């Protein structure tokens, strides 16, 4: 059998409560990952019983790197902290409701992805029957995705990261970080591929997560909604498309203090000024029914240029 060699991967799992799902995700990742990886976990202020289990798993070397935040700073912040904590050729975000079910899962993804791994990003799809944009390899099936990918088990290589940067932290506690990243790649001409995950990964969330899922829907609606203070994601889509802000976005948070596993973040002053300008642009965007004319676009450009150059 041909030996398949995988690059070192920083697998980062952002965590916020969901005790059973989180433990299932982390246990399966450690037990079934044969390829070289660093398992990084960033806890977003979960309840004490889960934090205790995470510390135990770190002590037992199930987890390689653990960060426990003092409160919930959002999915993007947690992912970005884990991302920049490890020097690795590839970064992988795995949600804490994804369970690995195959020992060769990571090898299979990289083998199917092939040399495209250096010039594209990839994310999972389950039981996809679409005949278009499909290509089969000896190691699995891939699909060329037109715009967006699932962020549930999402891989980005260093070359792409150097151009596009980190996840956007514009969207609050739960946002459109994966869709936003895909859009930035789209506007940079970077290809996106879906890999068939049905034999590799499964979701472990259930009916008891109804309250959590309702919270996610509410957060999504705020990011895309049409009310006066809603629609940051829709605005960013417009700004990227019209080159009014850069594709490598500014980070909201930086580390304030770190004591052992415990981390406190703070908002960067530069980001605070930038976000005020972004909210001003959001007001203009919504007042124009999301169809800004040339004069309104110029006001947006000037507002963003005052805080720094966020255009390409």
Regions found by a protein language model. Give the residues of each.
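N-proximal low-complexity "stem/linker" segments adjacent to membrane-targeting elements
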Residues: 1-28
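Short, acidic, metal-binding catalytic loop of nucleotide-sugar glycosyltransferases
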Residues: 27-36
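A conserved acidic beta->alpha catalytic loop
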Residues: 43-52
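Glycine-rich, basic loop-to-helix element that forms the pyrophosphate-binding segment
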Residues: 69-86
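A recurrent flexible, glycine/aromatic-enriched loop bordering the glycosyltransferase active site
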Residues: 76, 139-159, 174
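Short aromatic/hydrophobic "clamp" motif used to bind/position activated sugar donors
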Residues: 91
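Conserved donor NDP-sugar-binding/catalytic core segment of glycosyltransferases
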Residues: 103-135
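C-terminal catalytic/acceptor-binding lobe
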Residues: 173-311
């Amino acid at each position: 059998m041909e030996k398949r060699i995988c690059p070192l991967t920083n697998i980062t799992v952002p965590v916020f409560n969901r005790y059973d799902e989180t433990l299932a995700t982390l246990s399966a990742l450690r037990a079934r990952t044969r390829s070289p990886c660093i398992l990084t976990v960033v806890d977003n202020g979960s309840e004490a019983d889960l934090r205790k289990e995470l510390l135990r798993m770190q002590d037992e070397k199930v987890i390689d790197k653990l960060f426990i935040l003092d409160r919930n700073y959002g999915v993007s912040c947690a992912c970005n902290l884990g991302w920049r904590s490890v020097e690795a050729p590839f970064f992988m975000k795995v949600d804490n409701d994804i369970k690995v079910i195959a020992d060769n899962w990571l090898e299979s993804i990289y083998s199917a992805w092939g040399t495209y791994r250096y010039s594209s990003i990839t994310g999972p799809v389950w039981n996809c029957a679409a005949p278009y944009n499909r290509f089969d390899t000896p190691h699995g099936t891939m699909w060329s995705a037109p715009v967006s990918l699932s962020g549930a088990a999402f891989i980005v290589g260093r070359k792409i990261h150097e151009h596009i940067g980190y996840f956007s932290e514009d969207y609050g506690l739960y946002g459109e970080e994966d869709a936003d990243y895909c859009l930035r790649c789209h506007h940079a001409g970077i290809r996106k591929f879906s890999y068939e995950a049905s034999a590799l990964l499964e979701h472990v969330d259930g009916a008891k997560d109804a309250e959590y899922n309702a919270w996610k829907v509410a957060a999504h609606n705020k990011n895309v909604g049409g009310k006066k203070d809603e629609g940051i994601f829709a605005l960013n889509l417009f700004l990227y498309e019209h080159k009014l802000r850069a594709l490598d976005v500014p980070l909201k948070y930086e580390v304030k203090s770190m004591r052992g596993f415990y981390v406190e973040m703070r908002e960067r002053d530069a980001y605070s000024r930038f976000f005020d300008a972004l909210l001003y642009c959001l007001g203009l965007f919504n007042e124009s029914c999301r169809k800004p004319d040339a004069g309104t676009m110029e006001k947006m450009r000037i507002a963003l240029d005052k805080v720094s150059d966020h255009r390409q």
